[in-house]
Amino acid sequence: MPLVAHRELESLDRLRAEGQEILDVRRASQQDIRELHIGLLNLMPDGALKATERQFLRLIGNSNRIAQFYVHIFTVPGVPRSADMQAYIDSHYENFDDLAHDGLDAIIFTGTNPLHADLAQEAYWPHVQRVFDWADKNVTSVLCSCLASHLALQHFHGIARKRRDEKLFGVFSHRVLDRSHPMLANINTRFDMPHSRWNGISAAQLEARGLPVLVAGEESGVAMASSPDGFRQIYFQGHPEYDRSSLLKEFRRDLALYQDGKLPQPPKLPTHYFTPAGQRLIRDYIESGRPISDFPEAQLADEVDVTWRDTAKALFANWLGLVYQLTHKERHLQYMDGIDPADPLGRLRR
């Protein structure tokens, strides 16, 4: 499904340079096809804002080549911003009220770095709640990544995340628990997904509220779950969108904080991430005591095997295909005629 460059955005230019198909508005308007309008609520901090745009744009644009995608990127108040990044947002991001007026077929919520143990204390909490409530009544499906899943589960179901003894950080194996779910059709029954989080929500917490767990791992716990109907809200506790170097950059960031005395101990290596040669390289660097300016990031990036990308593409392709099947032809209406909003996949009445 090609992306449509309906607004000027640096991330689209980067993807075009990488060889991804990007349609201009003139060419897109000549194709007699129902486009999909996907909202991307980007809550990520400044350092990861643009990279997160590209990660989700790649997954959307690579899903298939039938429909057209207009991706509407927006954010909400409450996330600390530098003056330069706020200027970028003001120039390139869209306004939620305008999007709510025009309508969206689906929304992706990114994660972010929380500042408080209780998510309700975050400055962006009431603004995110407003988007959740609107989407619940107007959007075919909402897909949440990592911290966004915790926000949604606390808002809709009163489920509070729990602090882990240590950070879950690395790439972990998972197993599909519900092979009949259409989002999991024709994908590997066991696959990898990156995780990077201090907190989690357990299968027991979800099942107690009637929320089906779709994918889970022995080390990582729940990777994917959904709202009781199976589709209106999709929750990932991991990061299927991550690039090859995402965990590497997080490790470098935390190592720099440790060297600056802002963390009490050095970060642990991401689990199941580096090749044996990469693990030796990074241990040699740490033992040498060299400054962060000498961190061998480029060399380490070559020592990462990407084991999650194909499954991530398949998951997003299945999700977007279902959105395309279920959404109304008018973008401001939630479902096509005959679809039960309480059971859009028709699984509950079987």
From Swiss-Prot:
Annotated site (Important for substrate specificity): S196
List the residue(s) that the UniProt entry marks as the site Important for acyl-CoA specificity. N113, L147
Q: Which residues form the active site?
A: C146 (acyl-thioester intermediate), H239 (proton acceptor), E241
One GO BP: methionine biosynthetic process
Q: Which UniProt keywords apply?
A: Acyltransferase, Amino-acid biosynthesis, Cytoplasm, Methionine biosynthesis, Transferase
One molecular function GO term is: homoserine O-succinyltransferase activity
Show the catalytic activity: L-homoserine + succinyl-CoA = O-succinyl-L-homoserine + CoA
Q: Does the keyword Ribosomal protein apply?
A: no
Per the UniProt entry, the signal peptide is none
**Annotated pathway, please?**
Amino-acid biosynthesis; L-methionine biosynthesis via de novo pathway; O-succinyl-L-homoserine from L-homoserine: step 1/1
For this record, the Gene Ontology CC terms, alphabetical, are: cytoplasm
Q: Where in the cell is it found?
A: Cytoplasm
Q: Which NCBIfam families match?
A: PRK05368.1-3
Q: What does this protein do?
A: Transfers a succinyl group from succinyl-CoA to L-homoserine, forming succinyl-L-homoserine.
Protein name stated in the entry: Homoserine O-succinyltransferase
